[in-house]
Amino acid sequence: MGNYRIAVLPGDGIGKEVTSGAVEVLKAVGIRFGHEFTFEYGLIGGAAIDEAGTPLPEETVRLCRESDAVLLGAVGGPKWDDNPPHLRPEKGLLAIRKQLDLYANLRPVVCYDSLVSRSPLKPDLVQGVDFVIVRELTGGIYFGQPSAVVENGEEKAVDTLLYKKEEIERIVRMAFELARGRRKKVTSVDKANVLSSSRLWREVAEEVANEFPDVTLEHMLVDMRMQLIRAPKQFDVIVTENMFGDILSDEASMLSGSLGMLPSASLSASGPSLYEPVHGSAPDIAGMNKANPIAAILSAAMMLRLSFGLTAEAGGRARVWQALALGSGSRLGQRRPHLSTNEMVEEIKAAVLDYTAIAQIMTVYA
């Protein structure tokens, strides 16, 4: 039995719909397992710009800091594309990462058997793919000091890529700890043949590796992104800096066959962590009850496990959605194109509340 306070930041586009679905399933988990979840809502992204004049209001930061975890929908949309840089929705996401010290982003990449046919790659390449990308979130070029100047009539722009040793050390150590519970292999991705920051990254990775003699470390240049397509099953845990991780994780997300199935977690060293689906705001289908809620629901499942330590609840729920969304042929917008967001959520809620269904599902998927 537990009481947990969750800050919900729907954001833009389909963010409201998918977070609403995740909240409904969390309520079902609370009923089924005897937990109490309190949900409080805040603004971020374009919605915050429209209502509060800033992509991240102070009220939202305060709400998040006072909560046990944060559930985010999505930010962005063409409506704000012409805004000045400080009034872009994405600035809200960068700011909340910094404010909460969300230093590590975990993106599981799994291709389930039922989704193999949806992948753009050949089945023999993606069947059995199961790795995690660990991306550093609070350092690097996204948080450097950019500047734009005009000298002698010529426009110039500068972005600074800066990493401290301790920033690298803590993210690499997390990757090794994660790998120790998996297949015991870490692939560190850098650009050490060109960048000084990457040479430091590689040196620190070697130092941390000495603490984990049971885990294998390999280095790859970021040029290795072709390996994600050529031989994705070789990877277990990939760890990399902010910008490289941004690019690699988006590319890797397509291996699964559906962007709408992938969750992510952004972990804090000392405060609440944030959970969000990998997909974007999809403004073209916003409000149409067509959005796939599974990535948001799985993100909430990661919250149960990583922030609250509710392993049984998270694991059981993951099996519920797998059985419904994959095994029974209920994949939203794929096998049953007329299955709405709300219908998918209701199916998963019903299975969570039905003890018999959970027992059967866990037997099949254990």
Swiss-Prot record:
Binds 1 Mg(2+) or Mn(2+) ion per subunit. GO terms for biological process: L-leucine biosynthetic process. The keyword Hydrolase does not apply. Its cofactor is Mg(2+); Mn(2+). Its EC number is 1.1.1.85. Pfam families: Iso_dh. InterPro entries: IsoCit/isopropylmalate_DH_CS, IsoPropMal-DH-like_dom, Isopropylmalate_DH. GO terms for cellular component: cytosol. NAD(+) binds at residues 77-90, 280-292. Keywords: Amino-acid biosynthesis, Branched-chain amino acid biosynthesis, Cytoplasm, Leucine biosynthesis, Magnesium, Manganese, Metal-binding, NAD, Oxidoreductase. GO terms for molecular function: 3-isopropylmalate dehydrogenase activity; magnesium ion binding; NAD binding. Catalyzes the oxidation of 3-carboxy-2-hydroxy-4-methylpentanoate (3-isopropylmalate) to 3-carboxy-4-methyl-2-oxopentanoate. The product decarboxylates to 4-methyl-2 oxopentanoate. This is 3-isopropylmalate dehydrogenase.
